[in-house]
């Protein structure tokens, strides 16, 4: 059982969970667009969801385009989050600069260095075949024996 002042007491955990749940509900309610039935009848129509009976007619283009409007948001960054984002951007810029500096030291890679693994394996196998055609099998004439376990002279 948890101690008297422990943070993990069941009562405290249950209270914290229900508190977080209610805060989440309020947060979700702020983000969703309200229906007409849940708001007063004098609420601005732009802030509520359209009714199924509302007109879906599209206005014809008459040549006068509306002025572009900037999108507004009510969500702001906390000071802590803004500092964190700025710090991460500095880290990314420093890492990119470091990569560019190391890339400058190395010469441009040639076509041989850009070969894929498959091309390298093909080249190695063909070189083995060509060496075998030139030299044939190499038999070790060692009195100690060969890898086959028999003596070859």
Swiss-Prot record:
Pfam families: Alb1. Residues 10-30 have a biased composition (Basic residues). This is Ribosome biogenesis protein ALB1. Residues 31-44 have a biased composition (Low complexity). Belongs to the ALB1 family. Keywords: Cytoplasm, Nucleus, Ribosome biogenesis, Transport. One of its GO terms (cellular component) is cytoplasm. The keyword Calcium does not apply. Component of the nucleoplasmic and cytoplasmic pre-60S ribosomal particles. Its main location: cytoplasm. Residues 1-55 are annotated as: Disordered. The keyword Lipid metabolism does not apply. One of its GO terms (biological process) is ribosome biogenesis. InterPro entries: Ribosome_bgen_Alb1. The gene is ALB1. Involved in proper assembly of pre-ribosomal particles during the biogenesis of the 60S ribosomal subunit. Accompanies the pre-60S particles to the cytoplasm. It comes from the Eukaryota. It is found in: Cytoplasm; Nucleus. The lineage of its organism: Eukaryota, Fungi, Dikarya, Ascomycota, Saccharomycotina.
């Amino acid at each position: 059982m948890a101690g008297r002042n422990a943070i993990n007491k069941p009562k405290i955990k249950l209270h914290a969970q229900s508190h977080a749940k209610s805060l989440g509900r309020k947060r979700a309610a702020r983000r969703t667009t309200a229906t007409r039935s849940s708001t007063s009848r004098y609420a601005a129509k732009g802030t509520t969801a359209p009714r199924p009976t509302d007109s879906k007619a599209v206005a014809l283009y008459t040549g006068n385009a509306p002025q572009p409007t900037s999108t507004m948001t009510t969500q702001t960054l906390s000071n802590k989050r803004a500092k964190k984002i700025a710090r991460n951007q500095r880290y990314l810029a420093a890492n990119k600069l470091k990569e560019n500096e190391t890339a400058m030291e190395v010469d441009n890679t040639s076509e041989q260095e850009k070969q894929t693994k498959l091309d390298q394996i093909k080249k190695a196998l063909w070189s083995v075949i060509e060496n075998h055609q030139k030299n044939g099998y190499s038999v070790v004439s060692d009195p100690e024996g060969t890898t086959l376990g028999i003596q070859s002279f």
